[in-house]
């Protein structure tokens, strides 16, 4: 029955994408500066060649990113201000061939909030944003949504890794992410409405699945939480230097690899 439902869900997603013709986009209201990646001294710092000068830039995404951050690839930087900043730039995106991929882990939350406010996510059209960064127990979740007298706890996860058309999360071991889905699953088991929304920050994915090779614990925790009632959804977007374009929902496969 579960496999039959998954096939039906994939068919519905494909039909929705086929008949959804209106572009949904969020404008980017700042300028980018293009450079080429040199190296990454630590998780939060990149060195970039910008017009012949070597500059240091803050990296918002602390993930592994080895498939993306290769010497010489094109990088988009944003100029930052603030007297306490250690760098004057932040690394916002990277080109994988002609595909632009966001490296800003805050963008999925901002884009999700925009889509929720505009009621553009079909499966969340009836929900309003009630609170952000809402605590529950020892955890904090991105959104609390409200529909009449019903509440939902929503956690958003950023996805940047795609291999052979399959989006995968995480790209490195995430104990925090594992605890998040375990807690959401326990809440769902008690009758509390919970959802984890994976936002794929690139347009070249056809399917989502856990990254079993690098973090099987997260994959098993997600699958178990899903079986307990945690709702799992996946959307994806396309980034250009001028906007973020919503591409709709993606199908997923959470079945553990044998």
Language-model features: locations:
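Conserved catalytic cores of phosphodiester-cleaving nucleases, focusing on short active-site segments
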Residues: 35, 141-171, 184
């Amino acid at each position: 029955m579960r496999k039959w439902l998954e096939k039906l869900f994939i068919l519905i997603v494909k039909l929705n994408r086929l008949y959804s013709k209106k572009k949904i986009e969020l404008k980017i209201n700042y300028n980018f500066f293009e450079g080429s990646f040199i190296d990454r001294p630590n998780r939060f710092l990149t060195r970039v060649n910008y017009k012949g000068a070597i500059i240091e830039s803050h990296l918002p995404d602390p993930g592994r990113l080895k498939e993306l951050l290769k010497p010489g690839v094109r990088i988009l930087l944003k100029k930052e201000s603030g007297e306490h900043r250690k760098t004057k730039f932040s690394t916002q995106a990277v080109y994988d061939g002609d595909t632009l991929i966001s490296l800003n882990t805050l963008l999925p939350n901002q884009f999700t909030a925009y889509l929720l406010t505009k009621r553009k996510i079909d499966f969340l059209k009836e929900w309003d944003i009630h609170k952000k960064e809402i605590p529950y127990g020892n955890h904090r979740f991105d959104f609390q949504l409200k529909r009449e007298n019903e509440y939902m706890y929503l956690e958003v996860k950023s996805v940047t890794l795609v291999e052979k058309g399959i989006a995968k999360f995480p790209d490195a071991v995430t104990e925090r992410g594992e605890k998040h889905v375990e807690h959401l699953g326990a809440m769902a088991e008690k009758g509390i409405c919970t959802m984890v929304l994976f936002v794929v920050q690139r347009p070249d994915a056809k399917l989502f699945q856990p990254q079993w090779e690098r973090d099987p614990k997260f994959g098993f925790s997600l699958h178990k939480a899903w079986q307990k009632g945690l709702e799992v959804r996946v959307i994806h977007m396309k980034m250009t230097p001028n906007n973020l374009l919503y591409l709709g929902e993606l199908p997923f496969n959470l079945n553990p690899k044998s």
